[in-house]
Amino acid sequence: SSVQANGNNMFVMFWNSVWYSCGGAALGVFTSSVTAYVVAKYKFPGRGFIYGLALVTMMIPIVGSFPSQYKVYTALGIIDTPLLLITKAAGFGFNFIVLFSFFKTLSWTYAEAGFIDGASHLKVFFRIMLPQALPVIGSLFMVAVVQLWNEYMEPNLFLQSYPTLSSGLYIFQLEMT
């Protein structure tokens, strides 16, 4: 016999929570690390704007942006699909600020040595800079996983066909009271 809440198998909800949390965290930390590296190490017009945008995203309350998010996701046709995970860059602002600070303090001589050896910009990032940032990335990944694992509102609104444990436990609690 399976454990059910409102007709949904709890093991399926557990799997949905795992892919939502780990996938969203991995995607969020990866995009933050690439963006933070480029903004911290390369000089181009708009660097300050990107940094400011990351700060602003931390100031906007998430709940206040749900109506506009729902409208955009509906227009894109990604409501109730796993593609919604692409938009879920968990904690982008916080991750970006932490990684930006890390890459800003990292010496550029490592990259110069890679360039002298014939490495491309991508190879320098993936083979030299990213491995040095792995402790920071690991910490941010764990924080993002916990944040997404505890998320109730967004999966409940945008991924109704993929219920997570938090929504299943809420339904279970409602049935028991």
Task: Tell where the protein language model's regions lie, with residue ranges.
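A structural signal for multi-pass alpha-helical bundles of membrane permease subunits
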Residues: S1-T177
